[in-house]
Amino acid sequence: MKLTVILVLVLAWFHALSAPRTSHVLDRGGIVRGDTTRRTVHLVFTGHEFADGADTITAVLRRHHAHASFFFTGDFYRTPAFTGRIRALRREGHYLGGHSDKHLLYAPWEQRDSLLVSKREFLSDLEDNYRAMKPFGVTKRTSPYFLPSYEWYNDSISAWCAGAGLTLVNFTPGTGSNADYTIPEEGNYAPSDAIYKRILAYEASHANGLNGFLLLLHFGTHPHRTDKFYLRLDALMTELEHRGYSFTRVLDY
C-alpha cells in the first residue's frame, strides 16, 4: 500500500513538471505564445531553401546580445553551403530545432482538421529531420521543441509530436510577421514597412503587448523578394528594447 502511494505521488510530481506552464497559450495542442506576464519576445526563424539573411540576422543578434531560435528542415541541414552557418548558430548559443525533413504539408489549407499524411509518414519524416540535425549535436534531448512546416498543423500532429517526446510550438498570430517571405507577384504580398508597422501597432494596442510572443521570421527568402524584412530587424529590436522588451530563445526565461 505504501509503495502504491509513493508511486502515485512520484507520477503526479513528474506530470506537474512535464505539463505546460499555465501562462503558455495553446492552440490545437501546440504552444503559440509563452509567458504573457513577461516582457520577453522569442524571435523564431525558419529555413528550408534560402539563407540569404544569415549574415545580417546573426550580426544583429550579436549586436543586441540576444539569442534566438532557428527551426530548419532536414533539407536545409543537409545543404553543404549552409553547414558553416548552422555551426556558427550553434556555437553562439542559439536554439536549433526541426521544421520537418522535407517541408511536408500536414493538413489541407481549407480543411485543417483533416490530414495529408499518416502517422507513420509523419514520424518517419520527423526522425529523418532529427537524423539530419545529429551531425550538429542536435537531438530530441537538446532540442525538444518542434515547429511544423508551413506553420500549419492540427491536434493530431501535436499529439504525434508529444508521443515522440517533443513539444510542438508555432508562431503567435496577430502581427503578420510570418508574411515576410511573400513576393510582389503574389496576391498576398506584404511589404516590409507594412509588417514593421503592424508589429509595433499590435504591441501598442494590446494589453499584454508582445509579452511571450513567438515572433516568426524567415532566415532567407526568394530572390524575387528584394524588400528583405531582416534588414529591418535591427531597427525593430532597438525599438522593442526601448519599450522594455528582451529577447530569448524559444520559451527560455
Regions found by a protein language model. Name each.
Residues 1-44, 49-65, 83, 193-194, ...:
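N-terminal pre-catalytic segment of deacetylase/amide-hydrolase enzymes
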